[in-house]
Amino acid sequence: MTTPRSFGPLGDVALLRGHAPYTLAGYAGFRAVIDTDGAVPARLKALFIAVAAIDRRYPELARRELARGASLGLTVRDATAGLIVLSSLRGEGAALEFADVIATVFDDSGAPPPQDLPHAGPGEAEANFLAYFGTIPVPLAQLMRLCPGAADAYYLMRRGSIDANPLSPKHGELLLLAILAAGYSPMAATHVRGARMAGATDQEIAEAVLCAVPAAGIAAWIGVGAMLAPD
């Protein structure tokens, strides 16, 4: 029996081929959405899958998907968007793991010269929070009260993830959503709103969330899907 490419490595598991036709058919259906151009380009969806895989600590899945993205035209600069978002959202360990994956996939992953580091001016963090959230969320209000320097640091990192991302702000938001969906995080609601503010359609949001399925299963959709229900 020929194994359709859309199964991915799951199709190589003899026990699944012999006992789980519904599972493989369903997975192939998800792959048909996330492996091809749709509302979101396939090369970016491969990046989203790779970064979600790092979130779930599956570096081999991440390497395979990043290589697939590169074959579709994904660049090192594009991949750096994942490195930036992981640094902010999941910390040093996840970011370094993804940096290793980037180095194995791209023959030339040379970086440009270092840039000067920005600083947050007085009131800059608060203004950014108000512009994005509409109000100061309680956790950030307490961070500003108890450790203002850390509040500035939070602002700089979230600005790097969205406004200064090598991708567009819209695709930066969608990348964040893929990670949050993979982690079944309630924070996804904030970035559904942020993605819409950045111009994303619900179809784009849906495809980004589905990019979490290879690493986190169909439960990744359940946590976010209800947020897309029409008002």
Regions found by a protein language model. Give the residues of each.
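Acidic, glycine/proline-rich low-complexity segments that act as flexible tails and inter-domain linkers
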Residues: 1-44, 56, 60, 67-71, ...
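Amphipathic, charged-and-aliphatic alpha-helical interface segments
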Residues: 45-60, 171-186
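Short acidic/histidine-centered micro-motifs embedded in hydrophobic/aromatic stretches
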Residues: 51, 82-86, 101, 177-178, ...
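A short structural micro-motif
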Residues: 54-57, 85-92, 181-182, 211-218
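Hydrophobic/aromatic-rich structural module bridging two neighboring secondary-structure elements via a short loop
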Residues: 65-98
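Alpha-helical transmembrane segments and their immediate juxtamembrane flanks
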Residues: 114-118, 206, 210-216
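C-terminal structured interaction module
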Residues: 197, 203-204
